[in-house]
Amino acid sequence: QPAIEENIEYLHCHKIDNVEPLDAQFDRMPALFAPEDIALLLWPDFPIPPNQLDFEKRNESAHTRNSAPQIDKNMQQRHLEHYTNDSDTSPTLKVYFVLDAKKIPFLNTLSLKGKMKSLFQGKFGEDTEKVAPYLIEVIRDENHIHTGEMMGLFSLKSAQHHFNWEDNLGIFIHSYADFETVYQHLRKFPMLQDERGKWFFFRFYDPKVLHDYLAIIAKRSAKLHKFFGYDNNIIYAFGLGLGNRFYYYTLKTLPEETLPSPIVMTDWEIDGFKTHKWLETKEYLMEYTLQEYPQLYSEENKHELCQNLEEGYKKGYTYEISILQYALAKQSAVKNGIDFIALEEQVTKNNTAPLERAIKLCSLLNIE
C-alpha cells in the first residue's frame, strides 16, 4: 500500500436525508418494516403495500422521494455476471445485518428464522457471545419483512420492538453472495493487528466507525479491494444509519493493477480515525464556546476560535477541557492586551501537564 493517497475516490455514497424512524404504526396496516425510501433502496423489487387505513390513498403505490443511488454500471455488471447461473432467473440482492450484541440486553432470548452467527468462533466465541458481532440474514419473505422478528431496526424505542434505530445496533450489507460467503469474508476484520503486531478489536460493524473508516480509505484502492472482497464480488454495498440519515456505499471499478492490501490496520488508518475524532470534537467545542462564552467569541470571530482550538490541539493540550481553556485564555489575553506567548511560557515553567497549564492560564485571566 503506497503511503500517498490516489487522486480519485473509489466510493459512491448515496444519502437519504431527513429519515423519520417508525413509530408504533397504530395508524398503518400493514405496518412498514422500514421508511419507504430506505425500503425501496434495500429491497428494490419488493413492493410496499399501501396503507389500508388511509382511505384516500389505499390504492396508491409508494414512490421514493429521493433520487436513485449512483451505481457504477461496470461494477453492477461484474456482480450480476459473477452470480448468474444457467437458470433464467436473475440473481437478487440479499440483505444482511451485522448486529453489535454488546448493545442489546436480550441476545440469549433471541431466536430468529433467518441465519445468525457470531463472527467469533471456538472458545473465544463462547466467551464473547454476549458482546460479539453477529451476521444475520434478513429474510425476504413478505410476512417477515412487514411483521417479522427483525421489526424495529428502523423504529423508535417507543415502538417497543426488540431492535431500534436510535441505538445504532449495526450495519447493513447488500450482497448477491450466500450467507456463508459473506460470513467468511467478514470474519477477517473484527480483530486486526497494527504495523507493530499488536492485536485490537476493529468495530467496523458500528455505524459511526464504518462511516469514518470508509471516508478514510475512500482513495485507497488496495484497502477497498480487500474490505469489499473485490475479486469475488462479495460486498455489493454497505448501508448504515446515523442520526436522521441513511448512507449507502457502493464501490467504483478499481484500476486493473490493484492488488488487495494485507489485513493490517496501518498507521495512516489509525491517524485517520484520530483526525475524524478531532474534527468532531472541534465542531462540538466551537458550538459550545459560541453559546457559553459570547463575551469572547461570536460568529464574527469564529475563524479565530477555530484557529485557537486547532493551535491548542497541536500544542498537546489533548483533553477537550484543556483545549477549550487554551482557546478561551488566548482570546481573553488578546482582548485585554496581555502578551499571551510570554504568559504561557511563564505558566509552562511551573506546570508541565497540559491540563494543569490550561487551568492556570484560565485562573490568571479570571475565566470561569
Where are each of the predicted segments found?
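Short, well-ordered amphipathic alpha-helical segments that serve as non-catalytic structural scaffolds
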Residues: 1-2, 206
